[in-house]
A protein has these predicted regions:
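Catalytic cores of the polymerase beta-like nucleotidyltransferase superfamily
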Residues: 1-492
Length: 492
């Protein structure tokens, strides 16, 4: 998509471009002057390049986010200078500069302690591996550089004097809240298949829709994603999941997600044949993800968001039909944790995240009641399974179970009320203090040996674990005097 009247640049000089922009300011997509508040360090970087005789623009994510009223994105600059010329200009200005991507014309200048990527105008060669250009060609015109970019909202350039350069109606698409590929979508996705996940990521992060032709190309080009390294897929998928709009991603681009995470594909149209469920497994999963966001006011932890997506991942594999004709999924939480562990490892996500997600998946069907004993057992199981803080995960597990209940058939949603009572009990118990491991009891091994006249050895640990079991069962509180009194009763 190119807007009429936008590519009329008779000169590659800054003066020529400024004249061109003024001539074509009536274009619907070449914006009239806008005033964005550029940080002083970015202004300094532009000044250094321009004083050396080169042209420079701020591009990409900072421009996109600034037009939306957000200024959190890192600054990227594109310039007519070669990387060697950029480096020389910054060094002459006593600004530290590093060769961070010279094959692609990129150096990083550290201006007022802020890193700024500075890249030569370029166009990309063929993408023979569907991941990165086989070669790049450095060019003198910014139009050629903007033409290689992925989406219109990322293909705008800004200069404090020349204003906004918008050749592909990016500002219009921002206002319309739509993700739109630059040029022919199939070409963009064939060049770099990871752009399909980027389209979903931006749509989820910004709560945008996807333009019709771009959306159609997502479906048609989805198989190309299998050529991309798993860790690169993992990086993009993690940002989609952790943006908190997973249901939106499932709706917009499930064919792409199903290539990125093949384990999701069997969930689609899988009839659960259960009175507890009104939806197939994929629709139920999407509804659990949405309910999770609603219950946490959009502040769910990464582990909870992943667990919401993966909690029923093993249901198709564990499906069986009872004599009553109903569907059953015995063992699917435990099997789901195994599947999730392998999946997260393949995507190169952290072991800590994997441990927490797998614990939540494994225990998402754990039967709880509103008693201290049930709560303590749940926390201890979470702490053991996740190798981390079972109390923090207990909040996530209760939220996951609530979301799961709310995504079931209407008659079975009342369990969410019980879980809310469990949450209140959890808050009460946290104030009192909860032991998650035997080592957190208020008696030491030395005190156990003294009370029972034991010598150092395995028997001490056995007694400590027995005390912990009594504590979990609610038969004793974690107070030193109470625990010593239990030890004094004998029968150890």
């Amino acid at each position: 998509m190119t807007c009429e009247g936008c590519i009329l640049f008779p000169s590659a000089t800054a003066e020529g471009m400024a004249m061109s922009i003024q001539k074509n300011s009536s274009s619907p997509c070449l914006s009239r002057p806008v005033n964005l508040q550029i940080p002083t360090y970015a202004l300094r970087a532009l000044e250094v390049l321009e004083d050396a005789g080169f042209e420079a623009w701020i591009v990409g994510g900072w421009v996109r986010d600034a037009l939306r009223g957000s200024f959190a994105h890192d600054i990227d600059i594109t310039t007519s200078a070669t990387w060697q010329q950029s480096k020389a200009a910054f060094e002459a200005a006593d600004i530290p500069v590093h060769e961070t991507g010279i094959a692609y014309g990129t150096v990083t200048a550290v201006v007022e302690k802020h890193p700024i990527e500075v890249t030569t105008y370029r166009c990309d060669g063929e993408y023979l591996d569907g991941r990165r250009p086989d070669s790049v060609q450095f060019v003198s015109r910014i139009e050629e550089d903007l033409a290689r970019r992925d989406f219109t909202i990322n293909a705008m350039a800004y200069h404090p004097k020349r204003g906004l350069l918008d050749l592909y109606c990016g500002q219009e698409d921002l206002s319309a809240r739509v993700i739109h590929a630059v040029g022919e979508p199939k070409v963009r996705f064939t060049e770099d298949a990871l752009r399909m996940l980027r389209a979903l990521r931006f749509a989820c992060r910004l709560s945008f829709s996807i333009e019709e032709k771009t959306h159609q190309a997502l479906t048609e080009c989805a198989p190309l994603l299998s050529q991309v390294a798993s860790e690169r897929i993992g990086s993009e998928v993690a940002q989609i999941v952790e943006a908190g709009h997973i249901a939106h991603a499932i709706k917009l681009g499930f064919p792409v997600l199903a290539i990125a995470i093949p384990e999701l594909l069997p969930l689609q149209n899988f009839d659960q044949r259960s009175p507890y469920h009104a939806y197939d497994v994929l629709e139920h999963t999407a509804r659990v993800c949405s309910a999770t966001e609603a219950l946490t006011a959009g502040c769910a932890t990464p582990a909870l968001r992943w667990a919401a997506l993966l909690h029923d991942i093993a249901k198709p594999e564990m499906f069986s039909v009872g004599v009553d004709g109903r569907g059953h999924f015995y063992g699917h939480p435990e099997k789901g944790a195994i599947v999730a562990k392998a999946l997260l490892k393949r995507l190169a996500l952290s072991q800590h995240l994997s441990n927490e997600v797998c614990a939540l998946v494994a225990l998402h069907d754990y039967d709880v009641d509103v008693t201290t004993a049930s709560l303590r057992h749940m926390i201890a199981l979470l702490a053991e399974a996740s190798k981390s803080d079972g109390i923090a995960l207990a909040y996530d597990l209760l939220t996951l179970k609530q979301a799961d209940a709310l995504a079931k058939a209407n008659p079975y949603r009342s369990y969410a009320v019980t879980l809310e009572a469990m949450r209140a009990l959890l808050l009460h118990e946290v104030k009192r203090g909860i032991a998650q491991h035997p080592q957190e009891l208020c008696v030491s091994g030395a005190e156990i040996m003294e009370a029972l006249s034991l010598q150092p050895g395995p028997a001490v640990g056995v007694c400590q674990r027995r005390l912990f079991e009594l504590y979990l069962a609610g038969q004793v509180e974690n107070r030193r005097e109470d625990l010593l009194a239990i030890l004094a009763q004998g029968n150890w």
